[in-house]
A protein has these predicted regions:
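Alpha-helical transmembrane bundles and membrane-interface segments of multipass inner-membrane proteins
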Residues: 1-171
Length: 171
């Protein structure tokens, strides 16, 4: 873990940032009645508060035991994924490049904060609404996951190209 500590620093800071922002957004919107959208850039970017989450919509019948079991399973799954990533990082053999550490850290921050929100509120709230593009409303955790994926994929593609060029030059 020491070799790739930037992953954990980015994950910790990102998680605190995301959970804090999402808590503030929930507090602001749930104190307003009726719920309304707040234009940040009119017609382009709005804060639109929507509650829900696909995971808990599976349990619409209010079956308490299933809900408790699903939460426990969800928590255990996230813990297992975190330990798996930690194990992979320790087996990497050498320090990962900074870009990949940041990408993995962003993905972890988004996943952990979505999990925290799901556990505390029984749902995930989405609020970032790009009106300029036809995309679903999303939250900050989703953005961190997406950005982490983009950074990681770009890094791995360039790493592959660099390796291919090196192989080509040696032949």
């Amino acid at each position: 873990m020491n070799k790739n500590r930037l992953v954990w620093i980015v994950a910790a800071i990102g998680t605190v940032l995301i959970v804090s922002v999402q808590y503030c957004i929930r507090t602001i919107f749930e104190s307003r009645q009726p719920l309304e959208t707040i234009p940040l850039l009119q017609g382009i970017l709005h804060l639109t508060y929507l509650r829900g989450g696909a995971f808990l919509s599976l349990f619409n019948n209010n079956v308490k035991q299933l809900l408790i079991l699903s939460r426990i399973g969800f928590i255990l799954f996230i813990i297992a994924v975190t330990f798996f990533i930690s194990w992979l990082l320790s087996r990497w053999g050498k320090e990962m490049m900074k870009a990949l550490q940041i990408g993995v850290g962003l993905i972890l921050a988004g996943a952990i904060s979505n999990t925290v929100e799901q556990i505390i509120f029984n749902e995930n709230a989405v609020f970032i609404d790009f009106r300029l593009f036809q995309i679903p409303v999303f939250n900050l955790a989703d953005m961190f996951i997406y950005l982490g994926q983009v950074i990681s994929v770009i890094y791995l593609v360039f790493l592959g190209i660099k390796f291919a060029i090196k192989q080509w030059r040696t032949n």
